[in-house]
């Protein structure tokens, strides 16, 4: 099969011919039709995650080694399976969304179906080959979400959607305005989900005027603010009286400082972004304002199933999708790195034919 791989960090991804994976035991082989492009792929391709300042976490320390096949927003069809998978010939060809945040399978988190909390992750597109290959091996059928009736862009629910849904779920209170910092692909999806969950009013924050206009005019954000403004915190406080929750999809120093400054007493800050910010809040202030500070990393398999059910109910407004061939992945990464993508890029593989194994 053909796989687009990181052969050397910070260098272009290379198409390579590699052997087809073979399913054993409970494995399921999925033929990948499409795979969304995530900003995490940018970090992994460059070889490190910023920890703020000059500090960097090499991705090799997280279990990613070259050659690596990235891609975790996978939509495909069941192609083959191992003898203990619980599947039958009738399942071959069935469309699925792949839950990629697979854990070790043995720790307390995994046994409680909270694979995204596993300390020894085996995530597809990270520690294990992902959807930038034409076929992907999934350890267990329980990580496959039925996608009958959904289009091939639905793989974005596995990260772009799940990340927003799980982060919103972590906001403790629901009795006031909620802020979303960064209304790119994930933030725009979170806005769509927030509206489907009847949360709000929603305050959108970004540095891109076009994205803010889209959030307000097409996705229902009641208010929007350009975070480059010198007194944006004061503007938000004046307009809302403070926010009960902020989800930060950027995670830079400026965004965390802004988020904490506009929270009401008892408010919740949820960080998702990986842009290298550092949280510095006096403990006396933390106690006095009774703030809740949370990190959020994708979500659980159950949350993905809940999100897909929400999508099936027709309650989610689709975000803009740019469908492009997998051959253009390097160009897509360049645009994503430069912040020139509204919504999501979804790369499609060349036509392949599923067969039973």
Give the residues covered by each predicted segment:
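Glycine-rich cofactor phosphate-binding loops and adjacent beta1-alpha1 units
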Residues: 170-175, 212-292, 353-357
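Residues in the short beta-alpha loop(s) of Rossmann-like NAD(P)-binding domains
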Residues: 48, 208, 275, 299
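Mid-domain Rossmann-like dinucleotide-binding core that forms the NAD(H)/NADP(H) cofactor-binding site
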Residues: 92-95, 134, 148-229, 234
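N-terminal glycine-rich cofactor-binding segment
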Residues: 5-22, 39-80, 115-127
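Glycine- and other small-residue-rich loops at beta-strand/loop junctions that grip anionic moieties
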Residues: 99, 157, 180-183, 204-205, ...
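C-terminal hydrophobic helical "lid"/dimerization subdomain
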Residues: 257, 301-357
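NAD(P)H dinucleotide-binding glycine-rich loop of Rossmann-like/cofactor-binding domains
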Residues: 58-72, 101-181
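Glycine-rich beta-strand-centered segment in the early N-terminal region that forms part
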Residues: 21-35, 50-106, 145-149
């Amino acid at each position: 099969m053909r796989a687009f791989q990181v052969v050397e960090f910070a260098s272009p991804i290379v198409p390579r011919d590699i052997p087809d994976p073979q399913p054993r035991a409970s494995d399921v082989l999925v033929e990948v039709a499409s795979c969304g492009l995530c900003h995490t792929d940018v970090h992994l391709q460059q070889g490190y995650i910023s920890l703020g300042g000059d500090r960097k976490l090499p991705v090799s320390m997280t279990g990613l080694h070259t050659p690596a096949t990235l891609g975790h927003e996978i939509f495909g069809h069941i192609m083959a399976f191992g003898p203990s998978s619980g599947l039958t010939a009738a399942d071959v060809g069935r469309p699925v969304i792949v839950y990629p945040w697979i854990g070790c399978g043995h720790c307390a988190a995994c046994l409680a179906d909270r694979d995204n909390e596993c300390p020894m992750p085996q995530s597809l597109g990270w520690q294990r080959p992902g959807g930038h290959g034409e076929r992907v091996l999934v350890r267990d059928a329980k990580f496959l979400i039925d996608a009958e009736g959904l289009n091939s862009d639905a793989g974005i629910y596995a990260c772009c959607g799940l990340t927003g849904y799980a982060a919103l779920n972590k906001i403790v209170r629901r009795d006031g305005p909620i802020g979303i910092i960064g209304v790119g692909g994930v933030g725009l999806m979170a806005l769509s989900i927030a509206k489907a969950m009847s949360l709000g009013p929603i305050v959108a924050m970004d540095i891109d005027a076009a994205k803010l206009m889209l959030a307000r005019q097409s996705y229902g954000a009641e208010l929007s603010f350009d975070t480059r403004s010198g007194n944006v915190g004061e503007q938000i406080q004046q307009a809302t009286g403070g926010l009960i929750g902020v989800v930060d999809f950027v995670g830079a120093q400026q965004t965390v400082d802004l988020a904490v400054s506009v929270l009401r007493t008892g408010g919740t800050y949820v960080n998702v972004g990986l842009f290298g910010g550092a949280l510095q809040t006096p403990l006396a202030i933390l106690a006095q304002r009774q703030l809740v500070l949370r990190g959020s990393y994708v979500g659980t398999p159950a949350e993905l199933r809940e999100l897909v059910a929400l999508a099936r109910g027709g309650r989610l407004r689709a975000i803009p999708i740019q469908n492009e061939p997998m051959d253009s992945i390097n160009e897509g990464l360049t645009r994503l790195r430069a912040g020139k993508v509204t919504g999501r890029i979804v790369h499609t593989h060349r036509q392949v034919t599923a067969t039973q194994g």
